[in-house]
Amino acid sequence: MLPREIVVSDDASTDNTVALVQETITRCGMADTIHLTVLRNDPPLGVTRNFEQAIEATRCPLIALCDQDDVWHAGRLARMVSPFRQRADLLLLHSDARLVDDALAPLGSTLFHALEVKPSELVAIQAGAAFEIFLRRNLVTGATTVFRRSLLGAALPFPAEWVHDEWLAAIASATGRMDVLVEPLIDYRQHASNQIGVRKPTLADKIVKAVAPRGDKHRKRLGRAEALLQRLTLLGGAVPDSHLQAQLGKVAHQRFRADLPANRRARIPSVLAEALRGRYERFDRGLQSVAQDLLERG
């Protein structure tokens, strides 16, 4: 299966991207069958705004994101389009990916392994409980994603606080049904020039993160949670009340974390109380986030 159209939004690149795309389409004999739209940015818009521009320029009912220089496996589109034909309620579908180096040599791992995705998380998404999973963390990578264009009615405009793929997943999980395919359907390159890369964190990485300065990251997370709450509120009846109430709880939890005192000893009673209420487990990474709040330097 081939795409009906390709939208290229070139964010002020210097590697001849547009010419390469046009040359490839012509060489493969697809110039008469695939509609090509080329957008050029100068100055650059940045990752999220550039994707928003490209997505808005599409015309087809299903949109497959393709960023950086990742490689789709043969049959990837057909595999991902099929569930949309079978399920009218499906808004977004994503998959695993094989991690490769810049020469496409497999690195012996997958995206889900690097992200430490739990089987229980995948089962919950497949069972229709994706919003509960995304209250804790995002599992969707844009390069593995296909979604209905109709999702844009609720998702646009993308807020500045969010990355495009995380936002699309959050809105899809809040307003309808999303799903996940556990098989890797693309090769996801890892190299120095990646805009966004991934690797499984080591124990040392986690310790460094736990004791790192708090900085403004919790304020940023609060801003993200508030932006999503604002959008869900605006969407009204399209969002189940249970999701809205859950997001209110997420905002309260993120505000709690953002307002913790600089003195680590002073945090202990309130952090333990928040943990006993189950909010770290529901809205964050459980004991890992508890340890972070107890150990982070103010």
Identify the role of each PLM range.
Residues 1-201:
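Nucleotide-sugar donor-binding/catalytic module of glycosyltransferases
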Residues 134, 160-162, 166-167, 178, ...:
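C-terminal subregions of glycosyltransferases and related glycan-biosynthesis enzymes
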